[in-house]
Amino acid sequence: MSEFKNVTLIKKANVYYDGKVTSRTVIFADGTKKTLGIMMPGEYTFDTAAAEVMEMLGGSMEVLLPGAETWQSFHEGQSFEVPANSQFSLKIKEVADYCCSYLK
C-alpha cells in the first residue's frame, strides 16, 4: 500500500536519539495506528509495548530481534515482526525509511 486514505495524521513528530530517528503517527478509522519515519545512520535500541511490524520503505537496516544471537539484514520491500513487551536493536548504515504497524 503506497498511500493511506481517510486517516488522521498527528502533526507533531515523535523524536528519538537527538533527532536521528523521527516519525509521524497515522491513526485509522478503526483506531489502529502506524508510524511513518526516517532513521539516520547510527545504532539504536527500542522497547515495544504492543507487537509491531516494521516495513522497510527505503534503505536497509541490520536488526537484532528479541532472543536472537545473530543480526539479520532487511531491505526495501521487506518487513519483520517484533513481539509486545520486548526490545530490539538496529544498526543503520544509510538513511532508512520505514512504516511501523502496531498490532492489537
Swiss-Prot record:
Q: Give a GO molecular function annotation for the protein.
A: uridine phosphorylase activity
Q: Which key words are in the record?
A: Glycosyltransferase, Transferase
Q: List the disulfide bonds.
A: none
What is catalyzed by this enzyme? a purine D-ribonucleoside + phosphate = a purine nucleobase + alpha-D-ribose 1-phosphate; adenosine + phosphate = alpha-D-ribose 1-phosphate + adenine; cytidine + phosphate = cytosine + alpha-D-ribose 1-phosphate; guanosine + phosphate = alpha-D-ribose 1-phosphate + guanine
Query: By its UniProt entry, which InterPro entries does this protein fall under?
Result: Ppnp, RmlC-like_jellyroll, RmlC_Cupin_sf
Q: Transmembrane segments in this chain: where?
A: none
Q: What Pfam families does the database record attribute to this sequence? A: Ppnp
Asked whether the keyword Zinc is assigned, the reply is: no
The Gene Ontology CC terms held by the record are: cytosol
Q: What is its EC number?
A: 2.4.2.1, 2.4.2.2
Task: Tell me the HAMAP family matching this sequence.
Answer: Nucleos_phosphorylase_PpnP
Outline what the protein does: Catalyzes the phosphorolysis of diverse nucleosides, yielding D-ribose 1-phosphate and the respective free bases. Can use uridine, adenosine, guanosine, cytidine, thymidine, inosine and xanthosine as substrates. Also catalyzes the reverse reactions.
**Similarity section:** Belongs to the nucleoside phosphorylase PpnP family.
Name of the protein in its database record: Pyrimidine/purine nucleoside phosphorylase
The organism's lineage is: Bacteria, Pseudomonadati, Thermodesulfobacteriota, Desulfuromonadia, Desulfuromonadales
Q: Which gene encodes it?
A: ppnP
